[in-house]
Amino acid sequence: MEPPPAPGPERLFDSHRLPSDGFLLLALLLYAPVGLCLLVLRLFLGLHVFLVSCALPDSVLRRFVVRTMCAVLGLVARQEDSGLRDHRVRVLISNHVTPFDHNIVNLLTTCSTPLLNSPPSFVCWSRGFMEMDRRVELVESLKKFCASTRLPPTPLLLFPEEEATNGREGLLRFSSWPFSIQDVVQPLTLQVQRPLVSVTVSDASWVSELLWSLFVPFTVYQVRWLHPIRRQLGEENEEFALRVQQLVAKELGQIGTRLTPADKAEHMKRQRHPRLRPQSVQSSFPSPPSPSSDVQLTILAQRVKEVLPHVPLNVIQRDLARTGCVDLTITNLLEGAVAFMPEDVTEGSQSLPTASAPKFPSSGLVTPQPTALTFAKSSWARQESLQERKQALYEYARRRFRERQAQEAE
């Protein structure tokens, strides 16, 4: 039985906070006056929680008091299988759902989390992050931190995904640097539930996430501890990260994907891309004047067909009508986002890039040559090779389209 296909970025990230269901939207409107009152009240209570957490030293008493006060704020922290927690392990690995995951885990056990891509500041400290130096020195600093002999030892809580997801469908690819710190890590799973609205939105700031957390009746964070995992003999950091990712995904009932934070940024960019309107044409590839939008669509589809001759014309037209952009259509066809039955390419048609020279040398652009077709030893390496080939095909198809446009303009 084949494994289920990995979910795309549109299933890993929520773009809308409000529910689409009419009944839930009505319930949210009725709850709004109560939620606003709770928000104002909890803002004042939250200030007291912050002062208490700063005044009390790190201890079991402090965690109990702050955890109780956070429950009043609507942030409920629960844990399962706490007996599996090994206090000798210095690196904790978790999936990432909200900007406050590290605060919730810190209510259950002592831990420190570095803030990536941000300089040390008061905001960094007030949010409960560990202040570190530049990203270049991060790994070495964390290794020294874990190697310290201070008692009791403070473990590191790291999020290898580096970006938050909606916590429902799958996990982002785990970065390898958290697994280069020590040879033993203890993973944990984090599930977040919240009524009426989405738990997190892809382009929201931590301030807006905090306000929504104080607005809703409650947000439940469920932490489940897993057994510590040791690096196998000769196992690379990437393979270690992939093994832990698959274990965490299995415990969550989700799928470990190969998507990265860069894919999230690209997905957000596509969401902001304007759709095709009847009276407008795309700015990237100007179309010749035509009497109707249908004729324009046919002309653009025919040009894409010349670049990708194995794709049926009706498939190209359908995706162009949906995206309104040649760039996105070529990307979807090359990445397999659009299902189709390939057509037989005639002998006179051009194929995709090979080791031969490009047909249009006058453009001054160098066509990337695909790498040798070797079968990598690890699944991670095979996936990386596939991504490189897909990117090369995409750039080649895009370049051919531009060159045909330039020739017709001349």
Curated annotation (Swiss-Prot):
Keywords: Acetylation, Endoplasmic reticulum, Lipid droplet, Membrane, Phosphoprotein, Ubl conjugation. The modification Phosphoserine is found at S292, S363. GO terms for biological process: ERAD pathway; lipid droplet formation; lipid droplet organization; lipophagy; protein localization to lipid droplet; response to virus; retrograde protein transport, ER to cytosol. CDD domains: CUE_AUP1. InterPro entries: AUP1_CUE (IPR048056), CUE (IPR003892). One of its GO terms (molecular function) is ubiquitin conjugating enzyme binding. Residues 21-41 dip into the membrane without crossing it. PROSITE patterns: CUE. One of its GO terms (cellular component) is endoplasmic reticulum. The modification Phosphothreonine is found at T367. Coiled coil: none annotated. It is a peripheral membrane protein. The modification N-acetylmethionine is found at M1. It is found in: Endoplasmic reticulum membrane; Lipid droplet. Residues 259-293, 348-367 are annotated as: Disordered. Residues 296-338 form the CUE domain. It comes from the Eukaryota. The keyword Cytoplasm does not apply. Residues 1-20, 42-410 are cytoplasmic. Belongs to the AUP1 family. Plays a role in the translocation of terminally misfolded proteins from the endoplasmic reticulum lumen to the cytoplasm and their degradation by the proteasome. Plays a role in lipid droplet formation. Induces lipid droplet clustering. Recruits ubiquitin-conjugating enzyme UBE2G2 to lipid droplets which facilitates its interaction with ubiquitin ligases AMFR/gp78 and RNF139/TRC8, leading to sterol-induced ubiquitination of HMGCR and its subsequent proteasomal degradation. Also required for the degradation of INSIG1, SREBF1 and SREBF2. The CUE domain is required for interaction with the ER quality control machinery and misfolded substrates, ubiquitination, lipid clustering and interaction with AMFR but is not required for localization to lipid droplets. Identified in a complex that contains SEL1L, OS9, FAF2/UBXD8, UBE2J1/UBC6E and AUP1. Interacts with the cytoplasmic tail of ITGA2B, ITGA1, ITGA2, ITGA5, ITGAV and ITGAM. Interacts (via C-terminus) with UBE2G2; the interaction recruits UBE2G2 to lipid droplets. Interacts with ubiquitin ligases AMFR/gp78 and RNF139/TRC8; this promotes interaction of UBE2G2 with AMFR and RNF139. Interacts with apolipoprotein APOB. PANTHER family: ANCIENT UBIQUITOUS PROTEIN, LIPID DROPLET-REGULATING VLDL ASSEMBLY FACTOR AUP1. This is Lipid droplet-regulating VLDL assembly factor AUP1. It comes from Rattus norvegicus (Rat).
